[in-house]
Curated annotation (Swiss-Prot):
The modification N6-acetyllysine is found at K41, K123, K192, K241. Residues 368-413 have a biased composition (Acidic residues). One of its GO terms (biological process) is positive regulation of granulocyte differentiation. PANTHER family: CORTACTIN AND DREBRIN, HEMATOPOIETIC LINEAGE CELL-SPECIFIC PROTEIN. Residues 240-258, 265-276 have a biased composition (Basic and acidic residues). The modification Phosphotyrosine is found at Y140, Y198, Y222, Y388, Y405. Substrate of the antigen receptor-coupled tyrosine kinase. Plays a role in antigen receptor signaling for both clonal expansion and deletion in lymphoid cells. May also be involved in the regulation of gene expression. The gene is Hcls1. Interacts (via SH2 domain) with FGR. Associates with the SH2 and SH3 domains of LCK. Binding to he LCK SH3 domain occurs constitutively, while binding to the LCK SH2 domain occurs only upon TCR stimulation. A similar binding pattern was observed with LYN, but not with FYN in which the FYN SH2 region associates upon TCR stimulation but the FYN SH3 region does not associate regardless of TCR stimulation. Directly associates with HAX1, through binding to its C-terminal region. Interacts with HS1BP3. Interacts with FES/FPS. Forms a multiprotein complex with LYN and ANKRD54. Cortactin repeats lie at residues 79-115, 116-152, 153-189, 190-212. This is Hematopoietic lineage cell-specific protein. The lineage of its organism: Eukaryota, Metazoa, Chordata, Craniata, Vertebrata.
Length: 486
């Protein structure tokens, strides 16, 4: 331990005082909630002020000002006291030798004011003896001698009209001199020169320069810009490439399709007219001899074989659902042959939403009607729904129809097959699968996207060139010529 600490006991007593935040015991909170919120009442030490009454404040200030002025007049010095100035009243303190304010002194005038004839300055001074003898009087008028050029205009050598030729610069040219600038060589002889197209001095032309007659045909440096979407997606770029290459072919196919649709429309009207005239029970359809070309016939490879047939009375309903289907694989076989020869994807078929809607409506409406088996359910339909009645009578006229009418409507295998797949294919096309031949990226939310060798199930043939199916959990439209049925 340090020596300074030995023998010393330091203890500091700390007084315990009350908390500064405690309120006084006699405090009474007489302030309302509104006054507490807005500080409308003054509290000592609160730092808040009460609302100001401006009228009361003005009166109070005016009264305080009057009181202050009265005190200043009473206690301050009085203006009447003093002896200085004109109004000083303490006369006993004034200087006895001082002149008062009522004294007016007369100042003597100057001699020039008392006698105007006196003085020697100026024009009218009369004291000539005092004027400067060498000074010129006011009556003197000095005349400046004119310059020689003012007296005789023929004098001088400057300018155009100067006559003193001896004073001029011998090397200077006169005003009568006209200088002629020598023309350039190209102005004197146009045949000279080597520049431009018509220069004749070929020996001066650059040997390595290309002549004007050797100019090649101008070519464009334009490069077609590739969109970001096409650059990022190989399938989209490939699709755009073949769409541009097959532009003419697609137009030709659209024209053929329009003609075919018009011909089919006329055929339908003729068949409907014949079906209305003929009223006879439906007969079993015999399989007609297949002609050389059947563009709209559904092959047996596409549909599974039919195991059972419905009674003849239900044939109108079968034909009603089957009617838009036969035109589906019209372009499949030629496109498949084309794809086998060429690995490039074909052009997309035209999007015809009108055709898709026409095909879909009878399929979805006719599906629930196949459930009841009794025959009377199928007979009254043609009376209530004339559109279905017209289409439903197609199978009954197979024997009476001529040529193309028999080709459009299939024999017994196709109607029975269509009816058998009605409940499933009509709603979703279940049971039909296909494998993708090319890569396709759907452009819209209702289109399907797939890669090569992908399996597409639940195919519904809703249009000639566009089918609807399911792939990778998505359901949508896709081009029929991009896939091959299994």
């Amino acid at each position: 331990m340090w020596k300074s600490v030995v023998g010393h006991d330091v203890s500091v007593s700390v007084e315990t005082q009350g908390d500064d935040w405690d309120t006084d015991p006699d405090f009474v909170n007489d302030i309302s909630e509104k006054e507490q919120r807005w500080g409308a009442k003054t509290i000592e030490g609160s730092g808040r002020t009460e609302h100001i009454n401006i009228h009361q404040l003005r009166n109070k200030v005016s009264e305080e000002h009057d009181i202050l002025k009265k005190k200043e007049l009473e206690s301050g010095p009085k203006a009447s006291h003093g002896y200085g100035g004109r109004f000083g009243v303490e006369r006993d303190r004034m200087d006895k030798s001082a002149v008062g304010h009522e004294y007016v002194a007369d100042v003597e005038k100057h001699s020039s004011q008392t006698d105007a004839a006196r003085g020697f300055g100026g024009k009218y001074g009369v004291e000539r003896d005092r004027a400067d003898k060498s000074a010129v009087g006011f009556d003197y008028k000095g005349e400046v001698e004119k310059h020689a050029s003012q007296k005789d205009y023929s004098h001088g050598f400057g300018g155009r009209y100067g006559v003193e030729k001896d004073k001029r610069d011998k090397a200077a040219l006169g005003y009568d001199y006209k200088g002629e600038t020598e023309k350039h060589e190209s102005q004197r002889d146009y045949a000279k020169g080597f520049g431009g197209q018509y220069g004749i001095q070929k020996d001066r032309v650059d040997k390595s320069a290309v002549g004007f007659n050797e100019m090649e045909a101008p070519t464009t440096a334009y490069k077609k810009t590739t969109p970001i979407e096409a650059a990022s997606s190989g399938a989209r770029g490939l699709k755009a490439k073949f769409e541009s290459l097959a532009e003419e072919k697609r137009k030709r196919e659209e024209e053929e399709k329009a003609q075919q649709m018009a011909r089919q429309q006329q055929e339908r009207k003729a068949v409907v007219k014949m079906s209305r005239e003929v009223q006879q029970p439906s007969m079993p359809v015999e399989e007609p001899a297949a002609p050389a070309q059947l563009p709209k016939k559904i092959s047996s490879e596409v549909w599974p074989p039919a195991e059972s047939h419905l009674p003849p009375e239900s044939q109108p309903v079968r034909s009603r659902r089957e009617y838009p289907v036969p035109s589906l694989p019209t372009r499949q076989s030629p496109l498949q042959n084309h794809l086998e020869d060429n690995e490039e994807p074909p052009a997309l078929p035209p999007r015809t939403p009108e055709g898709l809607q026409v095909v879909e409506e009878p399929v979805y409406e006719a599906a629930p009607e196949l459930e009841p088996e009794p025959e009377p359910d199928y007979e009254p339909e043609p009376e209530t729904e004339p559109d279905y009645e017209d289409v439903g009578e197609l199978d009954r006229q197979d024997e009476d129809a001529e040529g193309d009418y028999e080709d459009v409507l299939e024999p017994e295998d196709t109607p029975s097959l269509s009816y058998q797949a009605g409940p499933s294919a009509g709603a979703g096309g279940a049971g039909i699968s296909a494998i993708a031949l090319y890569d396709y990226q759907g452009e819209g939310s209702d289109e399907l996207s797939f890669d090569p060798d992908d399996i597409i199930t639940d195919i519904e043939m809703v249009d000639e060139g566009w089918w609807r199916g399911q792939c990778r959990g998505h359901f949508g439209l896709f081009p029929a010529n991009y896939v091959k049925l299994l």
